[in-house]
Structure formats: C-alpha cells, structure tokens
Swiss-Prot record:
Tissue localization of expression: Red blood cells.
Gene coding for it: HBG
Gene3D superfamilies according to UniProt: Globins
Functional description taken from the UniProt entry: Gamma chains make up the fetal hemoglobin F, in combination with alpha chains.
Disulfide bonds: none
GO MF, one example: peroxidase activity
GO biological process: hydrogen peroxide catabolic process
Self-association state and partner proteins as the record states: Heterotetramer of two alpha chains and two gamma chains in fetal hemoglobin (Hb F).
CDD domains referenced in this protein's UniProt entry, alphabetically: Hb-beta-like (cd08925)
PROSITE patterns: GLOBIN
Keywords carried by this UniProt record: Heme, Iron, Metal-binding, Oxygen transport, Transport
Coiled-coil regions listed: none
Protein name: Hemoglobin subunit gamma
GO cellular component: blood microparticle; haptoglobin-hemoglobin complex; hemoglobin complex
Amino acid sequence: MVDFTAEEKAAITRLWGKMNVEEAGGKALGRLLIVYPWTQRFFDNFGNLSSASAIMGNPKVKAHGKKVLNSFGDAVKNPDNLKGTFAKLSELHCDKLLVDSENFRLLGNVLVIVLANHFGKEFTPQVQAAWQKMATGVASAVARKYH
C-alpha cells in the first residue's frame, strides 16, 4: 500500500486539474513505444508503428494513451485504494492480455517525463516525487495479480 501525505495528494490533484489527458496520454504511450520498442508487440492491431513520427501521429496510440491516463484519474480520485481501484485492470492485463508487468513501471516513468516536459518549472522536485510515487503505486497495483 502506498501512503500519500496531504501535500502529495494536493500536488497530484493540482497538476491533474490542469492536464490535457488526451494529449499527455498519447505522448506517454507514444514515448513508451518509441523508447522501449519491444512494448509494440502488445499493439499489433494499431497499424503503422514503423517510426517515431508514425507512432506519435497514430490515432490508436493517442486514443489508448487517453484511456490509460483516464485510469490514472481513478488513482488521483482514490489514492488510498490503488489496489482496489486497479484490481480488474490487473486481472485483465495478467490473465487475458499477458502484458509483462515491468511495462507498467516503464509507462509510469515515461508519464513523469511527459509531465515534467509539459509543466516545466511548475514540476518541482517535490511535485515530481509525488507523481513518481503515484506512478509507482499504480504500476504496483496493476501488477498485483502477477504476484
């Protein structure tokens, strides 16, 4: 279980309220597929993933990235119950989709990079620490069924 301080929750919620989920989600998933190309194997039905520009411009990547980041919204709303919040997604990714659980950690790290790039000076080390903690907590919760 991840324990968030009131300050961490406030920092996460403050940034979340300013976030364009569609844009940030697409960028995060796109970066994951570019930086860690072996993750592309889970997205065979997404069409052209042959280059960085093809990936970043792919509407299916953008749509799925939005869907993924909307799930992070559930975490922002329920930071004290990440395991419960992600129980069904954990089961889906483990039992049906057979996604390597390490990919959730990688995606969380990429999301933190996307947020830092977008929010600049507003993404202070304290805000980064809060978001990194959230990303790690979400990755652990989604990977829970694997253990």
